[in-house]
Amino acid sequence: MHSKSFFFPIITILLSFTQNALHTKDEWKSRTIYELLTDRFARTGEDYKTGCDLSNYCGGTFKGIQQHLDYISGMGFNAIWISPIVLNKEGSYHGYHALDLYQINPHYGTAYELKELIRTCHKKDIWVILDAVPNHMAPDVPISSINPFNKDEYYHDYCVIDDENNQEQRENCRLFGLPDLKQEHPFVKEKYLEWIEDIIDDYDFDGVRYADVPYVPKWFWKEFSQAANTYTFGVISSSSSSYIADYQNYMDGVGNYPLFYAMKEGICGGSMKRLENYLFSQHKDYISPKFNVNWLDNHDNARFLNWCNDKRLFRNALIFYFFYEGIPTFYYGDEQYFNGGNDPNNRENMFGFHYSDTDIYKMMKIANEVRRKYKVYDEDLVQRYADDYFYAYTRGNVLIAISNAMNLQRNINYHSFDEGDKLCNKLKEGDCVYVIVGNININMDGEPKIYVKE
């Protein structure tokens, strides 16, 4: 570890931690992630409903998260992805406008409280993901006030990205006008590589998520990932699997935006054949899809229920992506049917909404149990049936069936089960089918099905 100690050195003396056990991508593929915004998930102390200005801080804290870890683990999730932790420009509740890499955002809490959160997570077998943002620093502040990049020479000259297909512009110009760091500058490179290594050591983070990946040179991500020395994944907002797949050469996984777009087009108002087309692209392009991160909702896009106001289709989409190849990430509030639109409306506060009796909460608990018990994450995905209204795939002895229509019946004859095998739907008691003359006859009632071999 480098000589720099973060924030309050005495805290390291006061707290007793086990040595950081860095986790490989193979270890991470068995995990399921609950993504939350630190400012929006839970406040310290009493939990009651209240409104807030979604464009500013609402009051969520590290301690608030800590007090609701049982809510997260009760749903079956064993990893959390929290907001970027460092001091930000005032008003930047989301954490993506860093002002000082060596101070914790006081709105979230103290360095001690962050360490307490992570320590408590580890006691409950919950891993914690650090969100890293080495593309830029805070906008509209004097460069001299930014630590440690307080000189103009640490930034690219001002230019605007007017062509998102121009990689040189992406890497050297300003994303949304944000001061673009010059990663090729020796000081910038050295400080950020030291920072990622030290902050993981000091706080015992288990994995790292990268923001704004295509706006940073690939060679930097390679060195950054080596310094992190744990599981890393990055987000690239593109529908092209061939474009984002190359980034797996520089980090362990990528956020699966192409799958997100395929679900959006195929499940709500389109054809399920769109999912089939994506599967073929995935198998052709990715080094390994099992290390990618999949989601239905996230903090950058309007929620599913905002553009597709159908809870039944929402449940189908959740089960489809959750068992798909990759590490599933569930966005906070989906279990409460949040339906916010574009940023910041998709970043609702969840204060007073930690209900564990909703049907989505219960459904995801079952889904997590099945994924873990049957070690689905080790199995390849095999498509078994696809048409405009129905889609089915297996991973080992688990058969997933979804539909974008209400009532339909399908016979699956391409499968790996034996004659007479009994398959039961874990989401509905008594919903069992048998393999008869090589066929699995499935009757869909509009709800997703998780069949397992009994």
What is each PLM-predicted segment?
Residues 24-32, 37-203, 219-234, 241-243:
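Substrate-binding/active-site clefts of carbohydrate-active enzymes
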Residues 7-15:
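Cleavable N-terminal signal peptides of Sec/SRP-targeted secreted and luminal proteins
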Residues 331-336:
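Short acidic/histidine-rich active-site segments
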Residues 1-7:
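Bacterial N-terminal signal peptides that target proteins for export
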Residues 15-27:
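Bacterial Sec-dependent signal peptides at the C-terminal "C-region" and cleavage site
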Residues 14, 118, 122, 194-295, ...:
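Active-site-proximal helices and loops of the catalytic beta/alpha 8
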